From Swiss-Prot:
Cited SUPFAM superfamilies: N-terminal nucleophile aminohydrolases (Ntn hydrolases)
Full protein name: Probable proteasome subunit alpha type-3
Major localization listed first in the record, in broad terms: cytoplasm
Primary role: The proteasome degrades poly-ubiquitinated proteins in the cytoplasm and in the nucleus. It is essential for the regulated turnover of proteins and for the removal of misfolded proteins. The proteasome is a multicatalytic proteinase complex that is characterized by its ability to cleave peptides with Arg, Phe, Tyr, Leu, and Glu adjacent to the leaving group at neutral or slightly basic pH. It has an ATP-dependent proteolytic activity.
Keyword GTP-binding on entry: no
Biological processes annotated in GO: proteolysis involved in protein catabolic process
InterPro entries, per database record: Ntn_hydrolases_N, Proteasome_alpha, Proteasome_alpha-type, Proteasome_sua/b
Annotated Pfam families: Proteasome
Lineage: Eukaryota, Fungi, Fungi incertae sedis, Microsporidia, Unikaryonidae
GO (cellular component) term, any one: cytoplasm
Length: 232
């Protein structure tokens, strides 16, 4: 091995961390995930590379009040999902209250960041979008492979993320939409960035998250929405 070759946890002469950049690039090639904050909740959406006839592969419950959608290496994602659930349960058992969204994102972000600096490790190749509540208001947060945590109105990771994020920022109305309207608009935006017709209904996972209800849209309901959009 070339001892002069930069290790995965050291900076290059240009001040870059190549392995972190590679991990972020890997996420940008994975199945698309989108989150959007609405007047009555948060929409989480995931696009699978192949049809899914079994359990959800993109959207997961982390606690009674926090759900997530993930993008990147599946094994890495399952490890971080397990870690997040454990930390959320630890907070509940120790303090008797649900783990706040910001706190859980901090825990996951710190774990991700630690793997960018320890020798013999590599970054987690996965990004998460989290739906929850902050100070009584619906919120969408993220953690990326570097461990950075952010709060968003709308955000996308994965394939076609640049075009979709541009659309979320520039094409969506400033006024808040309800989850039903936002779901249709997100599907329209997704359809502009990639092929998306009724035959892709079984590749989509959609969650409507609110304080009172967490609803996974069944495939036949997603199919109906895509047929209506495709007909216009």
């Amino acid at each position: 091995m070339d001892d002069n070759k930069p290790k995965s946890n050291t900076f290059t002469d240009e001040g870059r961390l190549p392995q972190v950049e590679f991990a972020i690039k890997n996420v940008s090639r994975a199945g698309t995930i989108i989150g959007y904050v609405c007047s009555d909740g948060v929409v989480l959406m995931g696009v699978n590379k192949e049809p899914t006839n079994g359990p959800m592969e993109k959207i997961y419950q982390l606690s009674d009040s926090i759900y997530c959608v993930l993008c990147g290496l599946f094994g890495d994602a399952m490890e971080l999902k397990r870690y997040a659930r454990i930390k959320a349960q630890e907070v509940l058992e120790r303090f008797g209250v649900e783990c706040p969204l910001t706190t859980l994102c901090k825990f996951v972000g710190q774990r991700k960041q630690a793997f960018t600096q320890y020798a013999g490790t590599r970054p987690f190749g996965v990004s998460f979008l989290y739906a929850g509540v902050i100070d009584g208001k619906y919120a969408l947060m993220s953690t990326d492979p570097s461990g950075t945590s952010n709060r968003w109105k709308g955000m996308c990771y994965g394939e076609n993320e640049e075009a979709i994020n541009r659309g979320l920022k520039n094409d969506f109305p400033e006024d808040e939409m309800d989850m039903k309207t936002a779901t249709v608009e997100i599907l329209r935006l997704l359809g502009k960035a990639r092929e998306l017709g009724p035959k892709e209904a079984d590749r989509l996972e959609i969650l409507h998250f609110s304080k009172d209800c967490k609803k996974y849209l069944p495939c036949d309901e997603v199919l109906k929405l895509l047929e209506e959009i495709h007909a216009k």
